[in-house]
Amino acid sequence: MGATRARIAIDAMGGDHAPDEIVAGALRAQAELDADVLLVGDPDRLEASIKSHSDSVPVEIIPSEGLIEMNEEPISALRRKRKASINVAMDLVKKKKADAVVSAGHSGAAMAAALLRLGRIPGIDRPAIGGVFPTIIAGKPVLVLDVGANVDCRPAFLDQFATMGTIYSEYVLGTEAPKVGLLNIGEESCKGNEVSVQTYQLLEQNPHVDFIGNAEGRDVLSGQFDVIVCDGFTGNILLKFAEAVGEVALQILREELPRGIHGKVGTGILKPNLRRIKQRMDHAEHGGGLLLGVAGVCIISHGSSQAPSIFNAIRLAKEAADNQVSQRIQSCYQQTVTAASNGE
């Protein structure tokens, strides 16, 4: 995108802590990142929230009406509430008035809005959400997809996830020649159900990925793999479990640190280390999951996201937009689409 500043549309009404925490994260992004944020939502509430921050910076507000509630069926709600914040935000990307969308609201609605308004990239059967996990190697995260968009997957879907994940890992996470694994119950190519066996065969033949074999559950955080593919049912459970393990580990550390005067001294010495541990294990550091396979950049954040997570989600959106992830995926599949249309 050259010297052009990325424009990030924020669904400011979506999320458990909207709009205040969303606004706080957006204001920080406007101040610290080489990007412009567009706050989409109720102008009165957004202006009041902006004024409540002493470090507020000028941001653009895009009016919307209402939001998609968590108990609403996504498709019908999106069609009924055409001026809802997530619809308006997606339309900004569709009309080239923004380069990406960030939403901590109804994840199903965000995915549906992206599909309805932005559309799938030609050649992609199903979009997938990519979740970034820490590994035992500092600075070497692993991308897992899908983590929630598709409960059931065909082998062809998983094969496409591997290609999209490779592009994400290389251009956003900065991984050189990402190594891809298939989440399975054993290392051998014959292990798993029929979908796993067929997917293994497809991945071996995929010229766009460096497939190194099956990844067992114990391998996910080992640093051996850069991209791991699985269906969204398994991936979402893995994501939530990893989040819980991180929280439990931090709580155990707090409980087991020595108490009393000696404990305070020891804790003071260890404080920088504890801060780094928390940073590596905190899912808020990654901001959210990138919806891969749609014709635009869409970051789906955790519903409980607070300002730091929103800031990181905006940072991720900017990196994905600047590095043209969606366009690179489209270019990768253009040859396949052209061949299919020519009957090859």
Swiss-Prot record:
Locations listed in the record: Cytoplasm
EC number: 2.3.1.274
Biological process terms in GO annotation: fatty acid biosynthetic process; phospholipid biosynthetic process
Enzyme class: transferase
One CC-aspect GO term: cytoplasm
Catalytic function, reaction form: a fatty acyl-[ACP] + phosphate = an acyl phosphate + holo-[ACP]
UniProtKB keywords: Cytoplasm, Lipid biosynthesis, Lipid metabolism, Phospholipid biosynthesis, Phospholipid metabolism, Transferase
Family matches, as InterPro entries: FA_synthesis, Phospholipid_synth_PlsX-like
This protein's pathway: Lipid metabolism; phospholipid metabolism
Pfam families from the UniProt entry: FA_synthesis
Purpose: Catalyzes the reversible formation of acyl-phosphate (acyl-PO(4)) from acyl-[acyl-carrier-protein] (acyl-ACP). This enzyme utilizes acyl-ACP as fatty acyl donor, but not acyl-CoA.
Family label: Belongs to the PlsX family.
Subunit note: Homodimer. Probably interacts with PlsY.
Protein name, UniProt field: Phosphate acyltransferase
Lineage: Bacteria, Bacillati, Cyanobacteriota, Cyanophyceae, Acaryochloridales
Gene: plsX
